[in-house]
């Protein structure tokens, strides 16, 4: 049984992320979507919120597990007995960073492979950062995220507009 880990912040989970999950889950026996705590990135959604969102969008895949993690990816990969790390590449600009990370992961986890996947054409330009920015400026994000994610974004933006006591 081959287990793969698809790690990310998923802040928020986009149609591009789901596209990779759908395709990777057809390749591996189990795909663990690892939602990283990533406090250094100052996420828009809390880890708990991102886990709920990911479960709402991905819960129908029978061989996909959504799990949060903190700390090093290598420890999460080992804890899940994964043999493969799945990473998405949207553009050539992603490649240099991802290539460096794959090299480091190979050093830390010599028996684990990194597999790069590119999104389907219609999702190549989508990023969580851009989706958040559009949502915060009142734009339509419905083509980039699922309806449940759009609802989470709308509610979060409204709560932020009301101030810290909201």
Swiss-Prot record:
Q: Name one Pfam family in it.
A: CTP_transf_like
Name the pathway it acts in.
Cofactor biosynthesis; coenzyme A biosynthesis; CoA from (R)-pantothenate: step 4/5
Q: Which GO molecular function annotation, any one, does this entry have?
A: pantetheine-phosphate adenylyltransferase activity
Q: Which GO terms are recorded in the biological process aspect for this UniProt protein?
A: coenzyme A biosynthetic process
In the UniProt record, does the keyword Transferase occur?
Answer: yes
Q: Where does the chain bind substrate?
A: 9, 41, 73, 87
One cellular component GO annotation, for this chain's record?
cytoplasm
Q: Which reaction does it catalyse?
A: (R)-4'-phosphopantetheine + ATP + H(+) = 3'-dephospho-CoA + diphosphate
EC numbers: 2.7.7.3
Q: What is the purpose of this protein?
A: Reversibly transfers an adenylyl group from ATP to 4'-phosphopantetheine, yielding dephospho-CoA (dPCoA) and pyrophosphate.
Assembly notes: Homohexamer.
Q: What family is this?
A: Belongs to the bacterial CoaD family.
From the Swiss-Prot or TrEMBL record, give the protein name. Answer: Phosphopantetheine adenylyltransferase
Recorded source organism is Burkholderia pseudomallei (strain 1710b)
Lineage of origin: Bacteria, Pseudomonadati, Pseudomonadota, Betaproteobacteria, Burkholderiales
């Amino acid at each position: 049984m081959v287990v793969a880990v698809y790690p990310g912040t998923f802040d928020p989970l986009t149609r591009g992320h789901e596209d990779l999950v759908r395709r990777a889950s057809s390749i591996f026996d189990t795909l663990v979507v690892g939602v990283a705590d990533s406090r250094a990135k100052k996420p828009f959604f809390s880890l708990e919120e991102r886990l709920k969102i990911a479960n709402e969008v991905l819960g129908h895949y029978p061989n996909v597990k959504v799990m949060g993690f903190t700390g090093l990816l290598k420890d999460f990969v080992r804890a899940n007995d994964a043999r493969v790390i799945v990473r998405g590449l949207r553009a050539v600009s992603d490649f240099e960073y991802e290539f460096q990370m794959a090299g480091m992961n190979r050093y830390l986890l010599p028996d684990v492979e990194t597999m790069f996947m590119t999104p389907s054409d219609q999702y190549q330009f989508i990023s969580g950062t851009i989706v958040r920015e559009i949502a915060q400026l009142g734009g339509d994000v419905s083509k980039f995220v699922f309806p449940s994610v759009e609802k989470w974004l709308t509610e979060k933006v409204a709560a932020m507009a009301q101030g810290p006591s909201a």
